C-alpha cells in the first residue's frame, strides 16, 4: 500500500522534475487576503501572483497546501464525520503556471502522473470540460480519452473566477470511477451526487480577465491553477472508497479507539471520525498561531474543538482526551510539517485546557438538552430559547447543539435562537454606561453587533492585511473618507493593539490602493472588543469593504513592549524587597516612560530604590525567555500568577512568565502575571531599567515612574552632563562633587549660625523702635515687651525663651519687623499657664498687625501680620489683653 506521505512526496517530485519550484505550504492564516478567514485552496498563497501584484523568481510551482474549510461559505463542519469525504482540514496538492505553459502541457502533466507514475487505469477515469471549451475537449481526445468519457458541463461548476472581476477561465475536472457496486452516476447525470464517481483533480485554465459584468477579455499570458485533494487521491491509491479508511485517518482513529476502549465502527463510527478530523484541524491551527477565542478565527477553532470534545464525551472519555492524541498526529504528519513538532507542547496544552474547561459545563448542558428533548419525537424542533441558553450559559455553539440532536432526528429553531441573541444584545446596550455620549455609544454598539469583535493578530506580527468594515467620522458612520478627514476605522483583523490593561494603543499607518495612506495616531477598544484605529487620511480615499494593509509603528511598539515587561519585573522586585502586601494598583505603559502604582504605606528609602533597580537590571542581563500560556483565570492564580488591578478576565487568560527565581535547573519563574498586553520575547530586549521618581498617590498607594532602554540611557547621559557642569562650577572633578558640596553646605550652616547669633545679639542690645527698660507690672504680672528689626521668625523663639528665663515668672512678647511685615512671639512661664495663654496674647497682637490667626501652645505661640508699622500697637494690644486676665 502507498502511504499518504509517499503520495504527497511523489506528487511534488513529479512536478519538481518537470521544472516546477517546490513551494512549502503557507500558514493557514492568509497574509495577503483579509477577506478569507483561512486558506481554503492551494492557489490562495499565489493569488497576487496570478493578478500581477506580486512577482516571484519562478514561473511554475508545485505545493501541498494546508487548508481549512470551517467558516463562511466554505463550511464543511456540519457534514464532517457523517460522509466519506468531508473534512475541516485537508491538503490540496497543486501545480501552477504563471504565464508559462497552458492547457496542453497541464493536461499532459496530469495524465502522466495519474496513469504513469501512479498507474491508475485510464478506463477508470472520466473528465469534464466547460461546454464551450473545444480546445480542452480536443486535447483530451488527443491524449487518448474516448468521447464517451469527455463530458461537456454547461454550469458554473466548470468555470472558475476569482471574484466579480479579475482572472477567470474554464475548468476541466478528472473523476475516478469506484465501480458499479457504489451508487451514483457520472458527472452531469441525474444521480451525479452519488459516491461512485469522485472528483480527484481540477485543472483551471485562467485565460480571461473579467473587466466588468458584461466584459470579458483574453489574458495576454494565460495561467494554470490545479487542485487535488490529497485525502481523496490517497483513498484511490490505497484501494478504499472512504477517506477515513486511509492510513493517516486509520492511525488517528485507532488511537482514539484504544484510549477510550471503544469500537471504531458501529455506533461510535461517526464520533471517532469527527475526533480524527478535528484533531488535525485543531493541531494545525494552533501550530499556525490560532488560539481558542470568542471572536474570529479563534472562535471557529473553539467550535471545532468543542465539537470533537462532545464526541469524546459520547465515547465515555472520563478525562480530557484530545491532547493525548497529539503524539499520534505528530507521528503521522510531523515529518511533512515540522511546525507540528515544534508546536506539539503548545497544541497539547491548548487542547487540554480547552477540554478541561469545557467538560465542566458540558455535562450540565447535556443534562439540560436531555430534559428539553425528553418528550420530543423525531422531526420535532428544539425551541431557540433553549439553544440560546446552551450557548450563553454552557458555551455550546449553535452548530454543536444541532450536531448533538442530529442522531435523534431533531431540529433547532434558528430564528428563535437569533431572537434570543438579539434580545440579550438589546439588554446589554440598555445597560451600557459608555462615554455618556449616546450617539457615539450607539455607533459602536451597531458596529459590534454587525461585525463582532476585531481579531487581534499583533502578538505574532506588526503588520498584516485587513478588510475595512466601518468608517466613523464625527461620531457617525460614513461610507467613504477622503484626504484630510479625521476618522476612526474598524477592520476585521488588525495587528494594532487597542489601549487596555494600562498599555497605550498602537500608532502606525494604513495603506491601500491608489495611493491611500492613513496616519494612525492611536488605537482604542470601544466595548472592549472592537479595535478602533483613530487617524487622518493623508492621501487618497477609502471606502468600506476596501482591502487595507496595516503597519504598526515598530519602534514605538518595541519601546512599549520593553516598558510593559519592565512593569512585571518591577512588580516582582517590589514584592521581594518590601513584602507580599505589595499589589499593583494601576499603571500607564507608554512608549517614552511608564508609571506603576502599588500598595505600600510609606516612602521607599534610597536603599530600597537602589536594591529594586539592581534586581530588575540583573534579570534583564540574564536575558531569560518570556513565555506565554493560555489558562483559566482560576488555574492561573492557583499557579501563582498575579492579576492586574481593575482588570476583568474572561474564561481564558494569557499568562506571562519571565525570569528565574534562581539559576538552578528547574527554578520557578521570577514573575508570573495575567496579562493581555504585548511583551518582549527575551528580557535582554529591555536593555536597561531606571527609576526616576517615587511619590505618594494617595493614602497607602505609592507611584514609581521609570524608563527603559534608550530613554533610560539618555536620562543617565543628561544626568552625567549636569554633574560635569556642576563640577566645573565648583572647580572640582565630577567624582569629588559630593565631598565639595558637603564642605560648602557645612560652611553655609556655620555662617548662618554666626549670622543668627549676631542678629540675636543686636536684638538683645536694643532695637530702633523700642527698647526694653525692664519688665512692666500689668495686673500683678511681670510683662517684658520688645520690638526688633531684621530678625526672621525662626529667631524669635530663642529670644522669648531667654526672656522667660530672665523673668522667672511673667510674660514676654517680641515683635520683629522685616521688609514691612511683622512677626510676633509670646511666651508665658510655667507658673502662669493655668491663667494666661500665649495663644490668646498672640492672636491679639496679630489682629493689631492686620493679620489673622496665630497659634501654638499655652506657654509659647507665634503669628504674624502684613503691617510692620503697627508693631507698637501689637505690644499695646497684648498689654491690654493681659490687663483683662482675671487675678
UniProtKB/Swiss-Prot annotation:
Q: Which residues form the signal peptide?
A: none
Q: Which SUPFAM superfamilies match?
A: Class II aaRS and biotin synthetases, Putative anticodon-binding domain of alanyl-tRNA synthetase (AlaRS), ThrRS/AlaRS common domain, Translation proteins
Which cofactors does this protein require? Zn(2+)
GO MF, one term, reads: ATP binding
Report keywords, A-Z: Aminoacyl-tRNA synthetase, ATP-binding, Cytoplasm, Ligase, Metal-binding, Nucleotide-binding, Protein biosynthesis, RNA-binding, tRNA-binding, Zinc
Q: Give EC number(s), comma-separated.
A: 6.1.1.7
One Pfam family recorded for the sequence: DHHA1
Write out the biased-composition intervals (Gly residues): 851-866
Q: Which residues bind Zn(2+)?
A: 564, 568, 675, 679
- Reaction catalysed? tRNA(Ala) + L-alanine + ATP = L-alanyl-tRNA(Ala) + AMP + diphosphate
Q: Where in the cell is it found?
A: Cytoplasm
**SMART domains per the record?**
tRNA_SAD
GO cellular component labels: cytosol
Chain positions covered by the region annotation Disordered: 851-871
Where does it primarily localize?
A: cytoplasm
Q: Which GO terms describe its biological process?
A: alanyl-tRNA aminoacylation; negative regulation of DNA-templated transcription
Cofactor binding annotation: Binds 1 zinc ion per subunit.
Q: What is this protein's function per UniProt? A: Catalyzes the attachment of alanine to tRNA(Ala) in a two-step reaction: alanine is first activated by ATP to form Ala-AMP and then transferred to the acceptor end of tRNA(Ala). Also edits incorrectly charged Ser-tRNA(Ala) and Gly-tRNA(Ala) via its editing domain.
Q: Which family does it belong to?
A: Belongs to the class-II aminoacyl-tRNA synthetase family.
What NCBIfam families does the database record attribute to this sequence? alaS
Q: What is known of its domains?
A: Consists of three domains; the N-terminal catalytic domain, the editing domain and the C-terminal C-Ala domain. The editing domain removes incorrectly charged amino acids, while the C-Ala domain, along with tRNA(Ala), serves as a bridge to cooperatively bring together the editing and aminoacylation centers thus stimulating deacylation of misacylated tRNAs.
Q: What is this protein called?
A: Alanine--tRNA ligase
Which species is this UniProt entry from?
Rhizorhabdus wittichii (strain DSM 6014 / CCUG 31198 / JCM 15750 / NBRC 105917 / EY 4224 / RW1)
Amino acid at each position: 500500500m502507498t502511504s499518504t506521505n509517499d503520495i504527497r512526496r511523489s506528487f511534488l517530485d513529479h512536478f519538481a522534475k518537470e521544472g516546477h519550484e517546490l513551494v512549502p505550504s503557507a500558514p493557514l492564516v492568509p497574509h495577503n487576503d483579509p477577506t478569507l478567514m483561512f486558506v481554503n485552496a492551494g492557489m490562495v498563497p499565489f493569488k497576487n501572483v496570478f493578478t500581477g501584484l506580486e512577482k516571484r523568481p519562478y514561473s511554475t510551482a508545485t505545493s501541498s497546501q494546508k487548508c481549512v474549510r470551517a467558516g463562511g461559505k466554505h463550511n464543511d463542519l456540519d457534514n464532517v464525520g457523517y460522509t466519506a469525504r468531508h473534512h475541516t482540514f485537508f491538503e490540496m496538492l497543486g501545480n501552477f503556471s504563471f504565464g508559462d505553459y497552458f492547457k496542453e502541457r497541464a493536461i499532459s502533466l496530469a495524465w502522466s502522473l495519474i496513469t504513469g507514475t501512479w498507474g491508475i487505469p485510464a478506463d477508470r477515469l472520466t473528465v469534464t470540460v466547460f461546454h464551450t471549451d473545444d480546445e480542452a475537449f480536443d486535447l483530451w481526445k488527443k491524449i487518448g480519452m474516448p468521447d464517451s468519457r469527455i463530458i461537456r458541463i454547461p454550469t458554473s461548476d466548470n468555470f472558475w473566477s476569482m471574484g466579480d472581476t479579475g482572472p477567470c477561465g474554464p475548468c476541466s475536472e478528472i473523476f475516478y470511477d469506484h465501480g458499479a457496486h457504489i451508487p451514483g452516476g457520472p458527472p452531469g447525470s441525474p444521480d451525479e451526487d452519488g459516491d461512485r464517481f469522485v472528483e480527484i483533480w481540477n485543472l483551471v485554465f485562467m485565460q480571461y480577465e473579467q473587466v466588468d459584468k458584461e466584459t470579458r477579455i483574453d489574458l495576454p499570458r494565460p495561467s494554470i491553477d490545479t487542485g487535488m485533494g490529497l485525502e481523496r487521491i490517497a483513498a484511490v491509491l490505497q484501494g478504499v472508497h472512504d477517506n477515513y479508511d486511509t492510513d493517516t485517518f486509520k492511525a488517528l482513529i485507532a488511537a482514539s479507539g484504544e484510549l477510550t476502549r471503544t469500537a471504531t465502527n458501529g455506533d461510535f463510527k461517526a464520533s471517532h471520525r469527527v475526533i480524527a478530523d478535528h484533531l488535525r484541524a485543531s493541531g494545525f491551527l494552533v501550530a499556525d498561531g490560532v488560539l481558542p477565542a470568542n471572536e474570529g478565527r479563534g472562535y471557529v477553532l473553539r467550535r471545532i474543538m468543542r465539537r470533537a470534545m462532545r464526541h469524546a464525551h459520547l465515547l465515555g472519555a472520563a478525562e480530557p482526551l484530545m491532547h493525548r492524541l497529539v503524539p499520534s498526529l505528530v507521528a503521522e504528519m510531523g515529518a511533512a510539517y515540522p511546525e507540528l513538532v515544534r508546536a506539539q507542547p503548545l497544541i497539547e496544552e491548548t487542547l487540554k485546557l480547552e477540554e478541561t474547561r469545557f467538560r465542566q459545563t458540558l455535562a450540565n448542558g447535556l443534562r439540560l438538552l436531555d430534559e428539553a428533548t425528553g418528550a420530543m419525537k423525531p422531526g420535532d424542533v428544539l425551541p431557540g430559547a433553549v439553544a440560546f441558553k446552551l450557548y450563553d450559559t454552557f458555551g455550546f455553539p449553535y452548530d454543536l447543539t444541532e450536531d448533538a440532536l442530529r442522531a435523534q432526528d431533531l431540529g433547532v429553531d434558528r430564528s428563535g435562537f437569533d431572537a434570543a441573541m438579539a434580545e440579550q444584545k438589546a439588554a446589554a446596550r440598555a445597560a451600557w454606561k459608555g462615554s455618556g455620549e449616546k450617539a457615539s455609544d450607539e455607533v459602536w454598539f451597531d458596529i459590534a453587533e454587525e461585525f463582532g469583535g476585531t481579531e487581534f493578530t499583533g502578538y505574532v506580527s506588526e503588520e498584516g492585511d485587513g478588510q475595512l468594515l466601518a468608517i466613523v467620522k464625527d461620531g457617525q458612520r460614513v461610507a467613504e473618507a477622503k484626504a484630510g478627514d479625521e476618522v476612526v476605522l474598524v477592520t476585521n483583523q488588525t495587528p494594532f493593539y487597542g489601549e487596555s490593561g494600562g498599555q497605550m494603543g498602537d500608532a502606525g499607518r494604513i495603506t491601500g490602493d491608489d495611493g491611500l495612506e492613513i496616519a494612525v495616531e492611536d488605537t482604542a477598544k470601544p466595548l472592549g472588543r472592537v479595535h478602533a484605529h483613530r487617524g487622518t487620511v493623508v492621501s487618497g480615499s477609502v471606502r468600506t469593504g476596501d482591502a487595507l494593509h496595516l503597519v504598526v509603528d515598530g519602534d514605538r511598539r518595541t519601546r512599549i513592549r520593553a516598558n510593559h515587561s519592565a512593569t512585571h519585573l518591577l512588580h516582582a522586585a517590589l514584592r521581594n524587597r518590601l513584602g507580599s502586601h505589595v499589589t499593583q494598583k494601576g499603571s500607564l505603559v507608554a512608549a517614552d516612560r511608564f508609571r506603576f502604582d502599588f500598595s505600600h504605606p510609606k516612602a521607599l528609602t534610597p536603599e530600597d530604590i537602589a536594591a529594586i533597580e539592581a534586581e530588575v537590571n540583573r534579570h534583564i542581563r540574564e536575558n531569560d525567555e518570556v513565555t506565554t500560556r493560555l489558562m483559566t483565570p482560576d488555574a492561573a492564580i492557583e499557579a501563582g500568577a498575579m492579576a492586574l488591578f481593575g482588570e476583568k478576565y474572561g474564561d481564558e487568560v494569557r499568562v506571562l512568565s519571565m525570569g528565574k527565581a534562581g539559576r538552578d535547573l528547574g527554578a520557578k519563574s521570577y514573575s508570573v502575571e495575567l496579562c493581555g498586553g504585548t511583551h518582549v520575547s527575551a528580557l535582554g530586549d529591555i536593555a536597561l531599567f531606571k527609576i526616576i521618581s517615587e511619590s505618594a498617590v494617595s493614602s497607602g498607594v505609592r507611584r514609581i515612574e521609570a524608563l527603559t532602554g534608550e530613554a533610560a540611557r539618555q536620562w543617565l547621559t543628561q544626568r552625567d552632563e549636569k554633574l560635569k557642569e556642576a563640577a566645573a562650577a565648583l572647580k572640582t572633578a565630577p567624582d569629588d562633587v559630593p565631598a565639595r558640596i558637603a564642605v560648602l553646605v557645612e560652611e553655609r550652616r556655620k555662617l548662618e549660625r554666626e549670622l543668627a547669633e549676631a542678629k540675636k545679639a543686636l536684638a538683645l542690645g536694643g532695637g530702633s523702635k523700642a527698647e526694653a527698660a525692664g519688665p512692666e507690672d500689668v495686673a500683678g504680672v511681670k510683662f517684658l515687651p520688645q520690638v526688633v528689626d531684621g530678625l526672621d521668625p525662626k529667631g524669635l523663639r530663642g529670644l522669648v525663651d531667654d526672656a522667660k528665663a530672665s523673668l522667672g515668672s511673667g510674660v514676654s512678647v517680641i515683635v520683629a519687623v522685616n521688609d514691612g511685615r511683622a512677626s510676633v512671639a509670646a511666651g508665658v512661664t510655667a507658673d502662669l499657664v493655668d491663667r494666661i495663654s500665649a495663644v490668646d496674647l498672640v492672636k491679639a497682637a496679630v489682629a493689631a498687625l492686620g493679620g489673622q490667626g496665630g497659634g501654638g501652645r499655652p506657654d509659647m505661640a507665634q503669628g504674624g501680620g502684613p503691617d510692620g508699622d503697627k508693631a507698637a500697637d501689637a505690644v499695646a494690644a497684648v498689654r491690654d489683653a493681659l490687663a483683662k486676665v482675671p487675678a
